[in-house]
Amino acid sequence: MAGAKEIRNKIASVKNTQKITGAMEMVAASKMRKAQERMAYSRPYAVTMRKVIGHIALGNLEYKHSYLIEREVKRVGYIIVSTDRGLCGGLNINLFKSALVSMKEWKEQGVEVSTALIGSKAANFFERFGGKALAQVSGMGDAPSIGDLIGSVKVMLQAYDNGEIDRLYLVYNKFVNTMVQTPTVDQMLPLPKADDQALAKRHWDYLYEPDPKHLLNELLIRYVESQVYQGVVENLASEQAARMVAMKAATDNAGDLIGDLQLVYNKARQASITQELTEIVSGASAV
């Protein structure tokens, strides 16, 4: 029964793992609901900011902020939002693939690429990849604040102001639903114009008091910060959803494996009992 004993030990080990993955699934489900609430609270503000800024980009301002002006692209920057922890399926890998595809398109045109990395997984990946990181932040936990991000955002905005980058992108996982999280690459700077065709035909604009320069300087920075924060909370909700699904799959697979091992154990035990009975019968016959 040495083989059967080994199988019993393996079954016990898989059951312990199943308990862990089951607990992680429940924890991820709870955290996902909280992350969804946080995302739902911030999304209307981010969407409205994007709409207002898109309207401004369509307007005919005498004062043209540098964030509104297209310029020759020699260097691009990416703010890449990843997770701090693993065990969330292919969430990070799919995100990095999308970022690399976009980066490759620019590099083929001879454009330099710089990054600001949010989350330890992005830091580890692009350190091996050899990318130039201007800023890095991690360890924000399950309730990140916009204050945690201001440093990295400020570095990229200063690089843009100084002409060190000519275009800025935000890369994150957009939360669609529990089963679907979409890697997204959004252009942040220069500001993309609103794609509202009806709005474009009306040719209306805002009235600025006392003047557009001071207002735009503050508003455009808040816009970038709000979009990055929204990307972080969307990515956090995506992380918990992906982890919940991954842990459920692991728990289910552990159950299937336990069933298969139990069958093997029963067969081994049956074979052992049959052999013992055969030996007893053979011994009795010899007597």
UniProtKB/Swiss-Prot annotation:
Keywords: ATP synthesis, Cell inner membrane, Cell membrane, CF(1), Hydrogen ion transport, Ion transport, Membrane, Transport
InterPro entries in alphabetical order: ATP_synth_F1_ATPase_gsu, ATP_synth_F1_gsu, ATP_synth_F1_gsu_CS
Cited CDD domains: F1-ATPase_gamma
Source species, domain of life: Bacteria
Matching PANTHER family: ATP SYNTHASE GAMMA CHAIN, ATP SYNTHASE SUBUNIT GAMMA, MITOCHONDRIAL
GO molecular function: ATP binding; proton-transporting ATP synthase activity, rotational mechanism
Pfam families per UniProt: ATP-synt
Subcellular location per the Swiss-Prot or TrEMBL entry: Cell inner membrane
Subunit details: F-type ATPases have 2 components, CF(1) - the catalytic core - and CF(0) - the membrane proton channel. CF(1) has five subunits: alpha(3), beta(3), gamma(1), delta(1), epsilon(1). CF(0) has three main subunits: a, b and c.
Single GO BP term: proton motive force-driven plasma membrane ATP synthesis
Annotated source species: Tolumonas auensis (strain DSM 9187 / NBRC 110442 / TA 4)
Protein name per the record: ATP synthase gamma chain
Gene: atpG
Any coiled-coil regions, as ranges: none
